[in-house]
Amino acid sequence: MQKPSIPKGMRDFSPVEMSRRNYIFDTIREVYELFGFNQIETPTMEMLSTLMGKYGEEGDRLLFKVLNSGDVLADFCAEELAEKNSLRFAAKACEKGLRYDLTVPFARYVVMHRNEINFPFKRYQIQPVWRADRPQKGRYREFYQCDGDVIGSDSLMNEVELIQIISEVFRRLGIRTRILLNNRKILSGIAEVVDEADRLTDITVAIDKLDKIGLDKVNDELRTKGFGEEAIERLRPFIEMKGDNREKLDRLKSALASSETGLKGIEELTYILDKVERVQLHSELMVDISLARGLSYYTGAILEVKALDAEMGSITGGGRYDNLTGIFGLEGMSGVGISFGADRIYDVMMQLDLFPAEKLTGTQLLFVNFSEEDADSLLPLIQKLREQGLRTELYPEPAKIKKQMSYANAANIPYVALVGENERAAGQVNLKNMLTGEQQMLPADAATIVAAIV
């Protein structure tokens, strides 16, 4: 018999792993809702026409396509089958696909429901996405995204709120972080003043690698793309820019004085910094001119978050976009959003041992089952304990005490209650702390037992 297996790049999660993951998801959800965001969900499957062409050629290749129901081959003529063209086959045989991210489905949702939505629309979404990528360490075919967006508003106060959300989420999770901040308009201004305005993408792709490969290799990459030494020298002051946030912005204001676009980006960053300084931010906030993520669709602020105490790439990212819904015919709908990388956050918390033990406990109290009669007498008490929020189990059948204690140990249940004939007659519960081995006799009263455990 063939051993059961799961597809590569997919994962099972144990109860302990799910407790940890839900701790992250619940924290993100609670903070989003504190700031007035409302949750939506979109279907696992979208029409391929919704997904195709939105992620570039590489993204289209990584879409999981779903075969149509029924006898698919009956729709093909002999010549089409003989052609053995997988792309044409998929185009005709597959009308649906698994969502690649949460952004395009969100844009589709806004366009379809625009007459019902109250703008500005503050939405969050925590759902899995799928990519037909080559599985490797830290890269999966199924993973969760935790997105938050404000759409239908040009106000930079939305960026300020999203920065506060990021700071509060990581404060609650116990992760020290640095939020890197830049603006697409500043990058455009830099390209203008070095006389390479039409080569913005080449410039930003190279300088975005600065922290990974260093300045010399960034310059080498620029040379391989055809940049002359004069242009590289003009870029150097921007790439090497040091100082605190205000000093960087002052230098940029001088260096980009001839670029209206660049000055607009500086104005926007200055506004964000001014507002953020009025609140107590728990994360560091650093202007980083080399940050150039998502330039294919971000039009204003760009941000990325790094953990300070763990070796890990970006654990959150986001930015402002001006025309997300334009791909579905609704023009001019500005928005800004962020996405928490749940899997990377999980890995950071494991590295730093940040998951609180008390949050990861399943059952808090196990009642030993001595007999059917004893079990019957315990049911009302167990019901009251559950009503008071104590996660309580009754071992399902009478068994040897050793077996029931072993079950409690294996399940990391911190307390066990023993109520035999003597305890039942006295109206008491023998409560055992499984970590210390200490035992105490308590009245068989739900409030008293809860107080002793919690």
Swiss-Prot record:
Coiled-coil annotated spans: none
Enzyme Commission code: 6.1.1.21
Subcellular location: Cytoplasm
Keyword RNA-binding on entry: no
Keyword annotations of the record: Aminoacyl-tRNA synthetase, ATP-binding, Cytoplasm, Ligase, Nucleotide-binding, Protein biosynthesis
Keyword Aminoacyl-tRNA synthetase: yes
Recorded GO MF terms: ATP binding; histidine-tRNA ligase activity
Catalytically driven reaction(s): tRNA(His) + L-histidine + ATP = L-histidyl-tRNA(His) + AMP + diphosphate + H(+)
Family according to the record: Belongs to the class-II aminoacyl-tRNA synthetase family.
Record-linked NCBIfam families: hisS
Protein name: Histidine--tRNA ligase
Organism of origin: Porphyromonas gingivalis (strain ATCC BAA-308 / W83)
